[in-house]
Amino acid sequence: MEEHLKKRPQKKVFPKVKIDSLRNQAIEKIKSKLLPDEKIIKITLIGSSVKNSFGEYEPPGFRGSLFSDFDFILFVEDDFEIPKWLDREPDGKPFPDNSMNLAYRNKKFIEDKYDVEVFFIRESNAQNPAIQKLGEEAGIPMTSDSKHKHIIVYSKD
């Protein structure tokens, strides 16, 4: 696990009904902002909203927010252009090659409170077994038999 992830403050988990509602809002909004786009292969949601541990952090919060964020993984064609409404997230570094660490964030994406983090994985990298292994080790569901809990939000196929 990345070092900064170990230093999170305590979190008060929201009731499941609230998590489900917020998660559905985030899924609908990400789809409305990104689709249709022929260069998007798959959109996957991972993290606390899928594991039912989404909630509010004790001050000072984590990554500039008092709340959990929504973690989307986008598998895209190699020539996909990352949308301008997303800002680069310098802390998202699961891969040793920094050119592959395409982590982006949009602050207050849902209800003016909850951030979205979007991590892009280019198709040529997604098909590389060594990169699949690194991604899986970092908690990213890279393969169809991944052990990591996730929701497939969209798939081109």
Model-flagged regions — what are they?
Residues 71:
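Cell-envelope/extracellular polymer assembly enzymes that use nucleotide-activated donors
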Residues 1-67, 75-157:
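Catalytic core of pol beta-like nucleotidyltransferases
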